Amino acid sequence: SDGTQSRTVAWTVFDTGPRKAKNVILFVGDGLSPAHRVAARLLSKGIAEGKSLGKLAIDDMPHMALVATAGSDSIITDSANSASAYATGHKTAANAMGVYADRTANPFDDPRVEPLASLAKRRHGMGIGIVTNTEIEDATPAAVVAHTRRRAAYDEIVAQFFAARPDVLM
């Protein structure tokens, strides 16, 4: 072509669909209340005239929530059933994780609840990562994958990590 010809083309432009999350990070400050954050801020940044002299990195997180928890058998929670509620969206009894607790002798035969991380992996191919500053079999990190009525069953909980195969475990 010599560049003298022109053509008109009609394009139909469609809006893109809603963005889907690539990753979800749930940061759990086990036992971390607003009072603990205030104390950390005052001790690390200093105080003048009743006000903190700086902010913590957590203060700039774009999304944050405070959750009041209660177990299925008590208004007082422990790390196991509160972390299980975060991980599954279902309440359970004290010392239980990922189950509807019953009264049978076997703490591993209770009806199971699928953790949200497992659902995200199964349905959307997302990865599961668990990073903790305590032992992985401790109640808060274990609630991401464990199914038991007995939070102190550490050997069995570790075996459940091998079965769940999280992509990151530190």
Spell out what each predicted region is.
Residues 2-170:
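N-terminal catalytic scaffold of extracellular/periplasmic and nuclease hydrolases
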